[in-house]
């Protein structure tokens, strides 16, 4: 029954096709947890396992076609906006802890929030699948690439002081949660607004690394 329910989801269809043994093991464990506990316990278990699988396959995701990387960035931004609509604290916890954040785990099974969380995870595993089949080698972003990104951020109202704060982990940690959440949304919006495809590709390769590997 759990397998039937999960196969209505694009994410779980992808995982069953690409990681059949992992899928079977975790579906069986999810069924056991639900019978002995709660849906919240099952969600926590699945998130933990998904994060572990994502980290193991990070290099495959980063080797995907650029269209897949753009999709990851778009889905990450959509998820940030969704979580921010719940609260700045939830958005901030996601930025710091990823899907393993207790706040995110709590929202994962909830309508209105779970869809965006799942879509972001699904986008990463679509990239993993693509990168495993047809890996792409990429070069690192250059200073001139980051100058292009800074110009896009300036269009969004960023000052030089904002750029310095965002580049300084200590300063960012002292910034209001709501502003940090907005800045990270701007960061991804700016990447997606870059018109030079080669520049955008190099920057996404750098920016998405902590998203898929962290």
Where are the regions that the model predicts?
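N-terminal Sec/ER secretory leader and immediately downstream segment
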Residues: 1-99
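Aliphatic-rich, non-membrane protein domains
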Residues: 2-5, 9-17, 62-67, 115-125, ...
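Acidic-enriched, low-complexity/disordered segments with a strong bias for Aspartate over Glutamate
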Residues: 3, 18, 41, 65, ...
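Arginine residue identity/basic-tract feature
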Residues: 8, 16, 32, 54-55, ...
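Alpha-helix capping and helix-coil boundary motifs
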Residues: 35-46, 65-66, 87, 138-141, ...
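Extended amphipathic alpha-helical interaction segments
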Residues: 82-170
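A cross-kingdom marker for long, charged
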Residues: 158-214
């Amino acid at each position: 029954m759990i397998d039937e329910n999960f196969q209505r989801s694009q994410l779980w269809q992808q995982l069953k096709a690409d990681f059949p043994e992992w899928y079977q093991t975790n579906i069986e464990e999810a069924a056991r947890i639900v019978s002995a506990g709660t849906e919240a316990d099952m969600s926590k278990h699945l998130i933990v396992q998904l994060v572990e699988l994502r980290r193991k396959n990070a290099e495959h995701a980063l080797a995907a076609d650029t269209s897949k990387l753009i999709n990851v960035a778009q889905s990450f931004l959509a998820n940030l906006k969704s979580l921010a609509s719940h609260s700045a604290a939830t958005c901030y916890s996601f930025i710091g802890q990823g899907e393993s954040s207790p706040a995110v785990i709590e929202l994962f099974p909830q309508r209105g929030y779970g869809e965006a969380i799942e879509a972001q995870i699904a986008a990463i595993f679509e990239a993993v699948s693509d990168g495993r089949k047809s890996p792409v080698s990429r070069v690192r972003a250059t200073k001139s690439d980051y100058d292009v990104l800074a110009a896009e951020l300036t269009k969004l109202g960023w000052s030089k002081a904002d750029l310095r704060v965002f580049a300084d982990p200590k300063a960012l940690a002292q910034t209001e949660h709501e502003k940090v959440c907005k800045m990270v949304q701007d960061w991804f919006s700016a990447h997606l607004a870059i018109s030079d495809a080669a520049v955008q590709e190099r920057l996404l390769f750098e920016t998405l690394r902590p998203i898929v590997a962290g």
